[in-house]
Each structure stands twice: as structure tokens, then as C-alpha cells.
Design a protein with these regions (language model features):
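Conserved proline-anchored active-site loop of SAM-dependent methyltransferases
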Residues: 147-164, 479-493, 641
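Aromatic- and acidic-residue-enriched carbohydrate-binding clefts of CAZyme catalytic domains
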Residues: 162-179, 517
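Conserved SAM-binding loop and adjacent beta-strand
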Residues: 448-461
Length: 740
């Protein structure tokens, strides 16, 4: 409705304007079916790099960007301006104004380098953070990476009424909307349409997180924008304690929702194997069957050498000696005694003498190998200690490496287990300790910043797990997050790369808004948007980039090494073989399984990574700016657009740059960056020879206004990707020109 309202205000005839406004209001109140909402034009774009001049549109830096004026004249630093509806003029100091462009007016973006962090100088992988309104950043990215993105992960603002003080102003509601979700849906729709052009239609995934405020409307919107996608919604517990709603008379919310949209051949990969450590089975060394009893003969009988004493030290519970086999007519009570030891024989509880599973010389070898041990003490029974051993099959598995050996017990026997598990398919209901947003989101940020700079960051492991489901088998994938927030997605990508040696690249986009309370404080102190004091407290410069730098280098914002590792421990319960529950009635052990509490490592490989070691990664920070096409010489145009060419070529190596006063070179061949640019067609022969001699050059840009000439030149090049650039460089990257 905002579009209609805007058009209605432009009707000069007051009677006609009033009648049409009345009819529009009636239409707005009619019942709607399906996802029908009022469209909103994107907000005007502030052009901070363009000077305020007569004839241009401008808005107050402290006002709303859509409340713009037309500058009529400037005298002595004061601009005389005509308001938007042309009803009145006003005067403002020029320094209080910023040029703006309306939706549909072409603008010319460039990437201004702000900072870099390099912790892997030998790697040509560079992540990217772009400070920008994500709508315009997406327009630029659509040109750079159309159909090339493997995964988009976004955590958009949740449109909550009480969230104005966040770094993101999450409350997207227009007072004139009859449907309170319209402005938010309009904002999301325009960005999702652009995002659609980025995704690889043959195999990619879009991941969107949301809470109960907008999840129903978002689901409908996703179905509308992406009818070809397979859509799955997952419920994920992020706050086990629950968050009560206003008044405390409603359900306490513990979870949020994650939409997974799969395109083409995209498949959900099994989660890392749900490994259960199955302990190796220790069998009783005493034979079981009566046919195995002492003195028995015939089928199933044991040999004459399997009835003997095993001497157990009563203090250490270790075996000190294996006695000689006893003849059938010799009593077990007649054997020698060793001080401090018990002579243990294979005897049933009812006194029936049995046999051991092997003769003493074999038993000795088993004991020395760690394959035979003393079990529980049963001093009130004929056999005072249980003796246990590993069967031939288990021993064979140990020797063949099928059993994982954790170590040797103090008594000398091996501690081992089978890694029994299966590929686990993810479910649609997640309740994972590591996804707790407080413990593994807020706490991680607080250790980096040592103060609270961002509310409600995502759990690092929640994002890591989402990415893993689709990118574990794509080590060179491209990830985009255009609601970057605190920068969790890039942090998670680095974590995933560190696990498997991958080269996944992440591009993050975020604005540089300050919170509402910070804006009020800064305004009171005389600062306004665009001032250094204002900008340095914005989310991109104050949260996203510092978090990226610190996580890569392994330190907090004060340079102190981060403590701990990236593992996550959780309580677990395992079978306790050494304990038993005794019946109060009979005094005998109950045949029940006893469990003991222990600590389980949820991410064993991550537990080996010290946070202080950082990541072998690099990242570049840019600010999206806009140039005045009519006021920028070709030389500066080329210089300012070089980072865009670098990004389009894959962001290999450090972003190249040219000196401020440097002329446009006839050619640029940059093996470290994997791309080359020809600006002077007369130098083609030398250029082609140099490019074809560099195997690392995979992208070539040819500057020419001639389509036939371009085709002829690229026919002699070996590069994988070639692009034509117009001589008026800014025209190659013009965005915002209507229709979106």
C-alpha cells in the first residue's frame, strides 16, 4: 500500500486525491487470502562518497533517508532545499546533509578497502566482509557470482516489537500497513529474489533461521519465491531454560526454526557418525558347562591341565603366579599358600569344581599381553575372585586394529572398545547441547570482546552443524551470509575448514547500524551518521570485523590469547562393569545394568584445536561505496573497481591495489590473484603471451566496447573465464536501475 499511498499524494486535484484515497483505504480493509501484503519500495540509498551539490537529492544525516529534499542552491555552506512534495523550502548546513538516490535511479558501486587480517600468508584463500545495505550488496554480488553460490545462510531480523535496541533494528512495521508483517515481508522478498540469482540451481542450499514471530509468513514467502525448492523446516532448541513472553501467561519459548531449501541435486549428508564406544567383551575365564567340569571325560570335556591355582594379591588385585595343574585325585586345598595372596580355583557357587579356559602357560601369556585380568572380589564364595579374559576372536581384532586401545589399566590389562555406530540421518527436531545460544554464542563473543556488544548471537556449533549437512563433501564451496550480524557464519566456515583441510570461502554482508540507545547518546554528544565516532560503534566495525580478526588470530580484542579449545563436553552415562546393585532382601547382586556418569566429548576433532592457535585463514574488509559517474576520471574508476574484479575472479591472494596517482596500465597480469586485465587493445599480443604463459591465470578481463573485437581476442587465450568490460568502467557495475 505504501506505493499506492505515494502515488496518491502526487495527484494535484484535491477532490480526486481524496476520493481515490478513500477507495484505496476500502481495498486495504478487504479480507485477503494467502500471503498478500503491502509492497514497500526499498529505502533511498545514502551516497556518502558523493558531494552535495545543487540539483541533487539529499537527506538529513540525522533524519530518515526517505525524507529527502532537492537541493536548489548552496551559498556560504548553507543549502536551500525543496521538500519531497514540493510544498516548502528549508535551509540546512551542507555538512548535515547526505546525497541520496531513489529506487530506480542508477548508482555506481565500488568496494573501498578498510582492513585485512592475514594468518595464512601461504594460502590464497580470502574471506570477505562487506559493510553495506545488503540490498545493494546483493545486486553487486548477483553480477559477480550469479549461479555460483553453494550455500546461503542467513539469520534475518525477527521483526520483534521489543527489539529496537539491538544492533539490528528488527522491528520492521509501517504504521500505515493494515497487515503488520507487510514491511518485513516486503524487505525479505526483495532480498530473497536477489539471493535466488546467486544460488547454483543444480546443487545448492538456502538456510534461513527465524523465530515464532514470522516463521509462518516466512514459510509462505519462501514457497512463493522458490517454488522449485524442496523445503524442510527444523525445530531447534537454542534456550533450554526457556524465555517467557510478556506477562508470563504464555508458553515459554525454547526453540527457533530453521528452513532448509534444497535446489537441484542437493542432498542432506548424514551427520558425523553417531559413534557409541562398545567396550570389548571380557568373558569369564571359568568354563560354564558341566561337561567342562573337573574330572569329566568325553564330549566337551577339558584337558587334564586346566585345573590349577591362580594366585591373586589381596591388596593390589594383581596375579602373582599361575600354579601347576592338579591331578584329578589331588585336593585344591592341599596346594601351597602364598602370603598375602588367595589361591583362586574355578569353582561354581554350589561348590562344583570346573576348569579354566586354558592351561597355566597359556593363561600366563594372556596375562602378560593384557588379555587376562582379575574381576570382582567374591570372598564369601568358593571362587574368591572372578577371572576374566579376551577370547581368540577379540584378540585377533585387537591385533588387526579393529579395536581402539585407549590404554593399559593399572593392573596391566588393556582398555579398548569397538567404534560401533551408523550413519545418522538428521531429524527435524534438534535438541543439541552445543546449540545453546547463551553458552556457545553469547559466551564465545564475551570472551572475545570482554564486554557485551551484540545480543543473541547464534551458537557457533549450530551454524557449523547446518553447514556440515550440505558442505562436508564440498571443500571448495562458496558461502554467502547477507545478514552477517556478529560474524558467526565465517567463524563456522573457518572451523569446518580446520577440521578437514577445506578451502570453503565465505562472503559476509552487514550494515553498520548502531543501536537505538547508542544513536541517542551519540546525537546528544553532537555526532551524526558518517562521523568517525558514530561509525566506529556500528555493527560491522564494532562487532563483525573485530570478531573475525580475533577468531582468526586466536586472541581477544586486547590481544590476549583466547583460552580453551573448540571442543564441547556433555554429561553422559556408560555401563559400569565393576559395580553391582545388591538386593536388600537377599543380599545378592541384582541382575541389572549399572551406569556411571562420565563426560563425553561431542566434537573430538574440534577438541584438538586450541582457540589461541586461531585459524589458517585470511579475510578482507570492504565498505560498499558509490561514485559519481560524471565526476570520476577513468583512471580513478579503474583503481576503485579493482577490488570488484578481484572478487569476481575468486578473491585469490591479497586484494591488489594501484597508487592514487597511477595511470591506468595497459595491462595487469596478476598470477598471485589468478586474473589479468587488458586495458589497451594494441598490447594484446604481449598480453596474450604473458597470460598464456601463466598457468595460475584463470580469469581474464578485456576492456573494449567492440563485441567482435572481444570475441576475436578471447579466442587466443587459455583462461577458463573471460569477461568484457566497457571502457566507461562504471557502466559495467551499474545497479539499482529500476525493475527490482
Amino acid at each position: 500500500m505504501a506505493i499506492l499511498d505515494e502515488l496518491v499524494t502526487q495527484i494535484e486535484n484535491p477532490d480526486l486525491r481524496a476520493r481515490i484515497a478513500t477507495e484505496v483505504e476500502k481495498l486495504a480493509k478487504q479480507k485477503k487470502f494467502g500471503l498478500v501484503f503491502e509492497e514497500h519500495l526499498p529505502e533511498c540509498t545514502p551516497l556518502w562518497d558523493i558531494p552535495v551539490k545543487a540539483g541533487r537529492k539529499a537527506a538529513l544525516k540525522t533524519g530518515h533517508v526517505n525524507d529527502f529534499y532537492t537541493v536548489l542552491k548552496i551559498e556560504d555552506g548553507v543549502a536551500t532545499c525543496l521538500n519531497k512534495d514540493k510544498s516548502a523550502t528549508a535551509e540546512f548546513p551542507v555538512e548535515e546533509l547526505v546525497c541520496v538516490a531513489e529506487f530506480g535511479e542508477p548508482i555506481y558501486p565500488y568496494l573501498k578497502p578498510i582492513d585485512t587480517v592475514c594468518n595464512a600468508p601461504d594460502s590464497d584463500l580470502w574471506h570477505t566482509l562487506i559493510e553495506a545495505d545488503n540490498y545493494h550488496a546483493l545486486q553487486l554480488l548477483e553480477y559477480l557470482y550469479a549461479g555460483k553460490v553453494d550455500c546461503i545462510y542467513i539469520d534475518p531480523p525477527y521483526n520483534k516489537e521489543d527489539s529496537k535496541d539491538w544492533k539490528y533494528n528488527c522491528n520492521y512495521v509501517d504504521k500505515n500497513d493494515t497487515f503488520r508483517h507487510s514491511k518485513w515481508l516486503s524487505m525479505m522478498q526483495k532480498r530473497l529474489r536477489l539471493a535466488k540469482g546467486l544460488l547454483n540451481p543444480n546443487d545448492s542450499v538456502l538456510i534461513v533461521t527465524i523465530d515464532d514471530t514470522e516463521y509462518l509468513h516466512l514459510g509462505c514467502l519462501l514457497e512463493e519465491v522458490f517454488p522449485e525448492a524442496k523445503i524442510t523446516m527444523v525445530s531447534s532448541v537454542i534456550n533450554p531454560a526457556g524465555k517467557a513472553k510478556k506477562g508470563g501467561v504464555d508458553f515459554s519459548r525454547t526453540d527457533e526454526y530453521i528452513y532448509f531449501l534444497q535446489f537441484g541435486n542437493s542432498v542432506v549428508l548424514p551427520e558425523v557418525r553417531d559413534v557409541s564406544k562398545t567396550p570389548i567383551a571380557w568373558e569369564t575365564f571359568r568354563r560354564h558347562s558341566l561337561a567342562n567340569g573337573r574330572g569329566k571325560h568325553g564330549v566337551g570335556a577339558c584337558g587334564p591341565n586346566q585345573f590349577y591355582a591362580i594366585y591373586v594379591d589381596n591388596k593390589t588385585k594383581k596375579i602373582v603366579e599361575f600354579g601347576e595343574p592338579l591331578p584329578e585325585d589331588m585336593s585344591r586345598f592341599s596346594v601351597k599358600q602364598i602370603e598375602g595372596c588367595t589361591a583362586v580355583f574355578p569353582v561354581r557357587d554350589n561348590g562344583v569344581e570346573m576348569n579354566w579356559a586354558a592351561p597355566p602357560w597359556t593363561a600366563k601369556k594372556l596375562y602378560e599381553g593384557g588379555y587376562l585380568r582379575v574381576g570382582n572380589a567374591t570372598m564369601d564364595k568358593p571362587q574368591q575372585y572372578t577371572i576374566k579374559y579376551l577370547t581368540k576372536g577379540v584378540i585377533k581384532d585387537v591385533e588387526q586394529g579393529k579395536v581402539t586401545i585407549e590404554g593399559i589399566d593399572d593392573e596391566g590389562y588393556i582398555i579398548g572398545y569397538y567404534e560401533a555406530g551408523r550413519a545418522k540421518v538428521p531429524t527435524t527436531a534438534w535438541s543439541k547441547i552445543a546449540h545453546n545460544a547463551t553458552s556457545y554464542g553469547t559466551d564465545i563473543l564475551n570472551k572475545i570482546f570482554t564486554d557485551e556488544r551484540f545480543n543473541y548471537p547464534k551458537s557457533l556449533y549450530a551454524v557449523r552443524d547446518c553447514l556440515t549437512l550440505f558442505l562436508a563433501n564440498k571443500p571448495n564451496s562458496l558461502i554467502v551470509d547477507f545478514f552477517a550480524g556478529s560474524g558467526t557464519t565465517l567463524h563456522a566456515a573457518n572451523l569446518l575448514n580446520a577440521e578437514d583441510g577445506g578451502q570453503r570461502r565465505c562472503i559476509m554482508v552487514t550494515n553498520n547500524e548502531v543501536s537505538e540507545s547508542e544513536a541517542k547518546s551519540l546525537t546528544k554528544r553532537g555526532y551524526q551518521a558518517g562521523d568517525k565516532e558514530w561509525e566506529q560503534l556500528g555493527i560491522a566495525q564494532y562487532v563483525t570485523w573485530p570478531r573475525t580478526v580475533c577468531s582468526v588470530l586466536g586472541c581477544d580484542v586486547k590481544g590476549k590469547p583466547l583460552a580453551g579449545d573448540y571442543g564441547v563436553e556433555a554429561e553422559d552415562y556408560v555401563i559400569d562393569e565393576e559395580s553391582a546393585i545388591v538386593s536388600k532382601t537377599t543380599g545378592k547382586p541384582l541382575k541389572t545394568t549399572v551406569y556411571k556418569k562420565t563426560v563425553k566429548q561431542l566434537y573430538p576433532s574440534l577438541a584438538q584445536m586450541k582457540k589461541a592457535d586461531g585459524f589458517k585463514a585470511n579475510a578482507a574488509f570492504f565498505k560498499l561505496g558509490f561514485l559519481d559517474k560524471n565526476a570520476v576520471a577513468l583512471g580513478r574508476q579503474f583503481k576503485e573497481l579493482l577490488p570488484v574484479l578481484w572478487l569476481k575472479a575468486g578473491a585469490h591472494g591479497p586484494c591488489p591495489s594501484l597508487e592514487e596517482a597511477a595511470e591506468v596500465p595497459a595491462m595487469l597480469v596478476l598470477p598471485e590473484n589468478h586474473f589479468a586485465v587488458l586495458t589497451d587493445e594494441s598490447q594484446y599480443e604481449a598480453f596474450a603471451a604473458q597470460v598464456n604463459g601463466e598457468d595460475s591465470i584463470t580469469t581474464v578481463y578485456i576492456v573494449t566496447d567492440s563485441e567482435p573485437g572481444y570475441r576475436e581476442m578471447i579466442s587466443g587465450l587459455h583462461a577458463e573465464d573471460t569477461y568484457q568490460l566497457y571502457r566507461d568502467y562504471l557502466d559495467n557495475f551499474r545497479i539499482n536501475h529500476g525493475g527490482r
